[in-house]
């Protein structure tokens, strides 16, 4: 009696396993270093960072000193990120450029872990273009900014006033063009520089 090999379906769970291991490593590294990193909470000065945008240009938070800045840490494979991005774009269209900036920091691997279709090899630029995003998209594949801000999940967002102080921190997705967020941003924009 001979045993015939079962034909492969071509589907593998390996990409998902790699993604889970990567996320677990990021969380583990953040947990191990938590005593060495000062807490980032409402009322503290936002840590400065520098990271490349999608065209390779260097962007620093300090380049936006005197502006109100929304720093959003996200990934292409994150469903709540996908859901909140359109509201960020609407907010940016209404008040972006008048002393208000959004810096969306992707923690995706070089090519992105998953595309919009759920397949491996998602592209950050493709993601942003498919949603019509016009605010700056930054790329931090090492997760350094996530660690620096002690973010524990994606999306995690920090609203920073003209004085460099964190005024709001949101873990999870939200509707950024909702009145309570717009009112706070308008108050921060009205504050002296």
Q: Language-model features: where?
A:
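Structural microenvironment flanking redox-active thiols in thiol-disulfide oxidoreductases
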Residues: 83-131, 141-147, 183
